[in-house]
């Protein structure tokens, strides 16, 4: 599934990944994009918006590393309270831990 990305959302993702080491970013970027597109699809959206992108960003990061995401989201003025439930979600690309709905 390929869902369109708005230019503002693309830029926001680049900004959020900017502090990630390049060696990790090259793997993280495509996974975040795939997760964001999946979240957008599940929400019935035809384009990845900021909400779907942030959900994809959070769920792509392994759970044991998600504490560091709070700082990244805070720097980019993203409402942490709104996204707190997302921190408990599994990575939708990790088929070993997801259930078919």
What do these predicted ranges mean?
Residues 1-101:
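Non-catalytic accessory segments flanking P-loop/AAA+ NTPase cores
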